Amino acid sequence: MTRPQAILTDIEGTTSSISFVKDVLFPYARRAMPAYVREHGNHPQVRHWLNQVADEIGEDVPDDVLITTLQTWIDEDRKHTALKALQGLIWGEGYKIADFTAHMYADAALQLQAWHAAGIPLYVYSSGSVPAQKLFFAHSDAGDLSGLVSDWFDTEVGSKREAASYRRIAERIGVPASEILFLSDVIEELDAAKRTGMRTALLERREDYPTPRSADDVGSHQRVENFSQLVF
C-alpha cells in the first residue's frame, strides 16, 4: 500500500474494543441518564438535545418519557445524534471523576503516534458525538492521544453508511478521496467510503470478531487484524 495523504479512522471495533463501548460506556450512560436529565435538564445545551428527542417522538412529553425513550434507544444501539450527544455529556462526567478510562488497543495507540510523527494527518469519524470522541482520546488508557487528531467527524456530517458523508469529509479536510485511507470494522461503512474513491482497510480483530467475515462480504477491502499490519 502506498502512503496516504490522510488517515480517517473509526473508534469502536477499530482503535478500541467493542466490549468496552457495549459493556462499560453504554450501561454507564443508561444508569446515569435519569439523574443527569433531572439535574441538568434546564441547561440550554442539554435542553436542545432533549427537544430533538421530543421532536422525534412527535409529542410534547415530560422528561420522564424522554428518559425512557433515551434508555430504549441505548438498548437498541440507535445512532441518533441527540442520544450520542447526551451520552457524550454523561461520559464526560464519568471521565472527570475517573469512573473509567477509555480502552485503546496498544497497536492502535503506537501506530497513530507513529503516523502522526511521520506527518500523516489523522482524522476520526465515529457515530459517537465529537465531544465524546475527544473525551475518549483524551482519557484513553494509553494516555492523552487527542493531540494526534487533526479533526473529528460524527453523524452531523451524515450517516456512516452513505457515500455522501465521506465526500463531505474529503471536502472538509481538503484531501482527494483517493488519497484518504479509511479504517473501520464495519463492511457497510467501508463500502460507502470506497464508492467515493477512498482507500479502505477492514479491522478484523480476533477479540471483537472471533469468526472471520467471508471473502465475499469483505470484497476488495484490505483485511488486517491490527494496526501494525498497515504498512506503507
Swiss-Prot record:
What InterPro entries does its record include?
A: Enolase-ppase_E1 (IPR023943), HAD-like_sf (IPR036412), HAD-SF_hydro_IA (IPR006439), HAD_sf (IPR023214)
Give the pathway listed in the UniProt entry for this protein. Answer: Amino-acid biosynthesis; L-methionine biosynthesis via salvage pathway; L-methionine from S-methyl-5-thio-alpha-D-ribose 1-phosphate: step 3/6; Amino-acid biosynthesis; L-methionine biosynthesis via salvage pathway; L-methionine from S-methyl-5-thio-alpha-D-ribose 1-phosphate: step 4/6
Q: Describe cofactor binding as the record notes it.
A: Binds 1 Mg(2+) ion per subunit.
**Source species, domain of life:** Bacteria
Gene Ontology biological process terms in this record? L-methionine salvage from methylthioadenosine
Q: Which Pfam families match?
A: Hydrolase
Enzyme class, first EC level, given as a word: hydrolase
Catalytic activity as recorded in UniProt: 5-methylsulfanyl-2,3-dioxopentyl phosphate + H2O = 1,2-dihydroxy-5-(methylsulfanyl)pent-1-en-3-one + phosphate
Q: Which cofactor does it need?
A: Mg(2+)
- Single GO molecular function: magnesium ion binding
User: Does the record's keyword annotation contain Calcium?
Assistant: no
Q: Which NCBIfam families match?
A: enolase-ppase, HAD-SF-IA-v1
Its subunit composition reads:
Monomer.
This protein's name: Enolase-phosphatase E1
**What is the protein's species of origin?**
Xanthomonas oryzae pv. oryzae (strain PXO99A)
